[in-house]
């Protein structure tokens, strides 16, 4: 099969190449993509050439030309002779690149796929793998029901962190971002309150709303190292801070006694790949990758996990470079971007 695949050729340059995919081997599944979704943080880091993995010699796949994307939905068209449980015509979610078709090797980290509920459309399902990174805030927090939660940074990962916390029963849930459109999207999804940090000290605004000394749970989804101490300041004494956005770099200053130790905060990381760990480990509690993705698909299908206000652009593959420019420079217009292949 001939497939079209988006590649970041080098920093700030995106192209489309055609690749011949062979028939599936015995442990492979061929999927035709209907929709793929853009993970702004990861893809912009590669597009700008700043992603740290591009410079890691132990990760040879992370180099230019690089095929971006890790969240897609489509239809199985062929299965290898050794595959059971899958058949042509199955509608699936999978960690796919931005490509018109993909050959998945079962057993490989990116060779996983999950069946879609009958009432879930491809566009919504295309976001499920990205949503897992936001779900990490609720998973790492453990108890969420009835706990106050603030989400700092309302890009695509922050939106999913906020929406998953709402679905998990946190209350009240507060979104914090300087971009009005992002705050409105959070409100559309059910946020109890939103805060504009450019209008005044975010900590004071949060405490005024809660009537307490901070939130019991804070999710930092900014991807900015210096925002982690800010997130810590938003938490109440004894609260939890979960870092769900990838903070590439070093924070300028953290006073570990005053900001962390004396306040007995718990600060944890929640990269989505933690769910590849066995379910019994303390990292994910009762969760693993398959349970998380099935929950997300079911929650999307039922409406428990809202996509209200999230998708702002539906584009052709040829328009991905322009979308990257918009995500970088027009944050008041761009939030969720999906690529339509059919």
Where do the model's predicted regions map?
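C-terminal capping/lid region of NAD(P)-dependent oxidoreductase domains
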Residues: 212, 242, 249, 253, ...
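N-terminal glycine-rich beta->alpha transition that marks the start or flank
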Residues: 19-72
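A structural motif shared across PLP-dependent enzymes of the aminotransferase-like
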Residues: 96-108
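Mid-domain Rossmann-like dinucleotide-binding core that forms the NAD(H)/NADP(H) cofactor-binding site
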Residues: 121-200, 204
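Glycine-rich cofactor phosphate-binding loops and adjacent beta1-alpha1 units
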Residues: 143, 189-268
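C-terminal substrate-binding/catalytic core of Rossmann-like NAD(P)-dependent dehydrogenases/reductases
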Residues: 203-208, 212, 255-311, 322
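A glycine-/small-residue-rich N-terminal strand-loop-strand element
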Residues: 71-96
């Amino acid at each position: 099969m001939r497939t079209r695949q988006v590649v970041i050729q080098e920093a700030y340059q995106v192209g489309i190449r055609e690749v011949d995919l062979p028939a599936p081997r015995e442990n492979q599944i061929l999927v035709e993509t209907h929709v793929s979704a853009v993970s702004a943080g990861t893809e912009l880091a590669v597009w700008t050439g700043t992603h740290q993995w591009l410079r890691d010699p132990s990760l040879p796949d992370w180099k230019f030309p690089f095929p971006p994307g890790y969240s897609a939905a489509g239809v199985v068209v062929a299965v290898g002779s050794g595959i059971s449980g899958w058949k042509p015509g199955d509608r699936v979610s999978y960690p796919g690149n931005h490509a018109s078709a993909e050959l998945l090797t079962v057993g490989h980290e990116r060779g996983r796929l999950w069946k879609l509920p009958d009432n879930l459309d491809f566009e919504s399902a295309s976001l499920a793998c990205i949503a897992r990174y936001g779900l990490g805030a609720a998973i790492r927090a453990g108890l969420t029901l009835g706990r106050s939660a603030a989400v700092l940074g309302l890009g695509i990962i922050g939106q999913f962190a906020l929406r998953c916390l709402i679905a998990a029963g946190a209350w009240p849930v507060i979104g914090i971002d300087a971009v009005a459109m992002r705050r409105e999207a959070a409100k559309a999804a059910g946020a109890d309150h939103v805060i504009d940090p450019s209008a005044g000290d975010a900590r004071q605004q949060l405490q005024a709303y809660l009537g307490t000394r901070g939130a019991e749970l804070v999710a930092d989804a900014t991807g900015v190292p210096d925002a982690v101490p800010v997130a810590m300041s938003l938490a109440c004494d004894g609260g939890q801070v979960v870092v769900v956005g990838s903070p590439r770099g070093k924070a300028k200053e953290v006073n570990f006694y005053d900001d962390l130790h004396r306040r007995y905060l718990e600060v944890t990381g929640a990269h989505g790949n933690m769910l590849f760990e066995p379910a019994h480990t303390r990292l994910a509690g009762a969760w693993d990758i398959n349970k998380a993705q099935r929950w997300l698909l079911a929650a999307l299908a039922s409406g428990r996990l809202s996509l209200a206000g999230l998708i702002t652009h539906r584009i052709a593959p040829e328009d991905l470079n322009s979308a990257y420019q918009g995500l970088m420079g027009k944050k008041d217009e761009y939030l969720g971007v999906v690529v339509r292949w059919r």
